Amino acid sequence: MSIVVSKSAPVVVRPSEPATSTADKILLSTLDKPVATIPVTVLLAFDHPIHDATAETIKTALAQSLVHYYPIAGRISCDNDDGGHFYIDCTGEDLGVTFVAASANCTMEELMCLVDDQAPDDETAVVQQLAFNCTPDDLHHRLLWVQVTTLNCGGFVVGVTWSHGVADGPGIAQFIQAVGELARGLPSPSVVPVRLDDKIATQAVPPFTMAVHRFISGLKPVSNLDVRNVTVSSSLINHIIVGARRRATVFEAVAAVLWQCRTRVVMTDPEAPAVLLFAVNARKYLGAKDGYYGCCTAMHMAVSKSGTVANGDIMKLVGIIRRAKEQIPEQLKADDGEMMLRTMVGEKQVNGYESLLYLTSWRNIGFEDVDFGSGKTARVMTYPPRMLSMMPRIAPICFMLKATEEGVRVMSDCVTADHADAFYQEIAKLKATT
């Protein structure tokens, strides 16, 4: 089936009334700055229609939400007269976000079947048509782009692309939830948003997180990675959860599967370190205010020998990942991040492709709870090539998305085409053992 997505001309949506706060500048924190110019896209699918016109309802709620989240209507600027500090500029007549109304000649079932069958990085892939095609130049003028695509069945897909400098994953999920609440008729968002938090703004990046950033930036870039949708089955996840010495989490089970299966196909030296890098919502560790939606993400890692990861009991890998998570508070407080990192990784050479897997989880950060009036999100998706094309490719990456009855969906961008079939076969083999 050929699916055609028809788009209206982009329009600028501005706050529906003067903002609730009037700060002209919001300086980016040390956590915001490294990702200030990186665009990220999330696609949220909804099975049922809103009673009123879907696109217009969301557009109106978006304008109302910007009154409370007015910095999102701004733009990233650099103050060359004040040390070159990056900040969110909340002044000017052109404040607002970009909105596109679209339609597709298919049902949700037909669309999802095609999304699953197509390689996301294929230029003809329909997933590329479900969000605004943000360019590097767009990042100088806007912080948010929203596209609402309605389907023949009444379902719809909301594609949100945003600048990581204004919000991280949990932060933008909080904002989209607020849009949903106002679309449902609530007078104001249930969570009072905070973008200016003096404690976060003045706090240095934790030394261990800085050490991790320096570590990965020094690795050899990777290229020609194979982008595919893969599902880690519910039966395999449940087998691992129940079989672990201490009941495992879904994150630990899926991370162990991806880490082991990938290491099996890329490993060249069993003694070399295998590093599982993962992002952590650090709000509770850094003391961020409730409702803070700026970037508050820290990097952490689990490390073992490649041979252990590839050939060991997967329950042991779950334990390694769990212990790494338990060390997060200690790592965030450590004064000597470089020493802690060297202790974990050792002296062996770390190769960016063979040794490192970066896993970011979009589960349980709020995307599943968005509701514009017709029920909560049915499926969470992303389109990483658009984001990854605008940043150095250092680490092979996997995006862990919303769970379904079949299992946890993962957008995999972690192996080359030469290793792709073997990687997916390893996942199938693990499933066959349950």
UniProtKB/Swiss-Prot annotation:
Transmembrane as UniProt keyword: no
Swiss-Prot/TrEMBL keywords: Acyltransferase, Transferase
The UniProt record lists the keyword Hydrolase: no
Pfam families per record: Transferase (PF02458)
Positions annotated as active site in the UniProt record: 164, 371
Superkingdom of origin organism: Eukaryota
Listed EC numbers: 2.3.1.-
Enzyme class: transferase
GO MF terms held by the record: hydroxycinnamoyltransferase activity
Coiled coil spans: none
Family stated for the protein in its record: Belongs to the plant acyltransferase family.
Note: Plants over-expressing AT15 have significant reduction of ferulate in leaf cell wall.
UniProt function note: Involved in the incorporation of ferulate into the cell wall.
Name of protein: Acyl transferase 15
Organism: Oryza sativa subsp. japonica (Rice)
